[in-house]
Amino acid sequence: MLMRQKGIIIKAVDYGESDKIITILNEHGAKVPLMARRAKKVKTGLQAQTQLFVYGLFIYNQWRGMGTLNSVDVISQHYKLQMDLFVSSYASLAAETIERSMDEGDIAPYNYQLLQFVLEKIESGTSAQLMSVVVMLKCMKRFGFTASFNRCAVSGNDTQADLIGYSFKFDGAISRQEASKDVHAVILSNKTLYLLDVLQKLPIDKMNSLNIHQEIIDEMSDIILMLYREYAGMFFKSQKLINQLKRLEQ
């Protein structure tokens, strides 16, 4: 059966000498794996069209199991996401988080909206690292956990100015008054905890101007990755490249 669906490539894996297996997140919020034959050959024209983040109309044959890609009518190549390694790696982290949050057969229209929103924001100049934080905050429940940043997990104190870190012992933010009860709590700036709470709760269609200091973004990114590792046992492939790039900067 010939299928035509708009979608965004969220995963691309080389298969053999000349083929690729791509996964698109289609406009209905479903993951669709496709075999792209000879996609690594320049003459086929599919090499550029099967890159990560390509948004287009995908035409493919689908019978049982994996479909076979025929062609792609590209709507947006998202070139800006490919031009900078840091931007590309954090955009990949966002895409990988969404892809791994979904089981085969899941339908999640919100994930498609979230991915479109994030890629458009990055293209317009918003920090890709910040956008990866937004995605990971929004996808937490799909990985089976949540995190609270707006009240002390020990005392219930919700005075934001008193919160000084995150406690894995008590599974939540911790206040300075209770800090002695967990000497291993991850110390975070008050602003980091506040913004994590805001971004977690704020609908994406209300996120207009996102101008946050880099030190705060770094803190948010680090604690979010720790949460995923501790609560969901997740280590993302994109994170390996990010860690390598950070080491090169030092």
From Swiss-Prot:
Q: Which GO terms describe its biological process?
A: DNA recombination; double-strand break repair
A GO cellular component term found in this entry reads: bacterial nucleoid
Q: Does the keyword Glycosyltransferase apply?
A: no
Q: Supply the Pfam families for this chain.
A: RecO_C (PF02565), RecO_N (PF11967)
Q: Spell out the SUPFAM superfamilies in the cross-references.
A: ArfGap/RecO-like zinc finger, Nucleic acid-binding proteins
The answer to whether keyword DNA repair applies is yes
The UniProt entry, under InterPro entries, shows: ARFGAP/RecO, DNA_rep/recomb_RecO_N, NA-bd_OB-fold, RecO, RecO_C
Keywords of this entry: DNA damage, DNA recombination, DNA repair
Say what the protein does. Answer: Involved in DNA repair and RecF pathway recombination.
PANTHER family reported for this sequence: DNA REPAIR PROTEIN RECO
Q: Which family does it belong to?
A: Belongs to the RecO family.
Name this polypeptide is given: DNA repair protein RecO
Which species does this protein come from? Staphylococcus aureus (strain MSSA476)
Gene name, per UniProt, is: recO
